Amino acid sequence: MFTGIIQSIGKLKKEKNILIIEILDQTFDMQIGDSIAVDGICLTVKEISNNQFKVDVSEETLKKTTLGEKSSINQIVNLEPALRISDRLGGHIVSGHIDGLGKVVNIEKLEKSWLLSIKWHNKNFSKY
C-alpha cells in the first residue's frame, strides 16, 4: 500500500523488460524485495547498486501503463516507497495496481489546483 505522496524522483533507463532507475535523492531508503511505486505503479526492487535500482516489468505492464511510453533514456519518474505501519497517513491509501486505462481529455487550471477530465476505456469506472 502507498499514500500517493511522492518521496523522490529518478531517471529511467530501459533494457527490454528491466527498468533501471537512478535515484536523484540519496536519502531514498530501500532494500531488495521492497515494493516501490514508480509513477504510481507498484514494482518490486530486484537489485540495488550505487544510486540506482532495477525492477522487472512484464510486457503487460509496459502496454497498460505510462512506463511503456517512457522509452527515452533519462525520463524523470516519481518514486514512493511502500507504506510502513509506523508511517503517517498524510495522503491516501492506494495499492499501485493498475485497474484500467483512461485518456485525459481536458485539463483545467483552477485557483490552487488542476481539474483533469478523464475518459475511461472501461465503463465500470465511469462512476468515479
PLM feature spans:
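Conserved loop->alpha-helix
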Residues: 1-128
